[in-house]
């Protein structure tokens, strides 16, 4: 179960990273609902650039996760705790520095994904 869950995380992270890199607006408006069209051209371009840079960070992490699954399976628990903490803590930062949007973006479920991943982490260390 843990192994297949790890593959789901890799797929999700690859998809998310590529969306931020290659989507015209980096997913900022089309997915997250940030009203780029109401911002100046320069401000919107800066936000899109930040999303693309974040996408490359996610892509690097995804490549490491893939390497762990393929070559270093004994590190899957470490991978799970890193992904869990990243999602949970990003959700915490979102409470402290929240986005002002009409609707919650899909990333709002990030803490839930983090908690599920944390549960799978505990399963993974119990199995070892």
Annotate the PLM regions:
Residues 77-95:
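Hydrophobic alpha-helical membrane segments
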Residues 31-66:
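Core segments of alpha-helical transmembrane spans in multipass integral membrane proteins
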Residues 32-34, 100-112:
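Non-cytosolic membrane-interface motifs at loop->transmembrane helix junctions
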Residues 115-128:
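Membrane-water interface at the C-terminal end of transmembrane alpha helices
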Residues 21-31, 84:
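Membrane-helix interface motif
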Residues 1-23:
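N-terminal signal-anchor transmembrane alpha helix
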Residues 62-77:
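Juxtamembrane helix-break-helix junctions at the cytosolic face
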């Amino acid at each position: 179960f843990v192994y297949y869950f790890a593959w789901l995380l890799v797929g999700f992270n690859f998809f998310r990273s590529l969306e931020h890199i290659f989507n015209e607006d980096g997913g900022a408006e089309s997915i997250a609902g940030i009203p780029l069209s109401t911002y100046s051209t320069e401000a919107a371009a800066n936000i899109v650039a930040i999303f693309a840079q974040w996408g490359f960070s996610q892509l690097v992490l995804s490549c490491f996760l893939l390497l762990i699954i393929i070559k270093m399976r004994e590190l899957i628990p470490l991978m799970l705790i890193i992904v869990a903490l990243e999602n949970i803590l990003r959700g915490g930062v979102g409470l402290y520095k929240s986005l002002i949007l009409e609707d919650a973006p899909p990333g709002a479920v990030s803490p839930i994904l983090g908690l599920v991943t944390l549960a799978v982490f505990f399963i993974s260390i119990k199995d070892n």
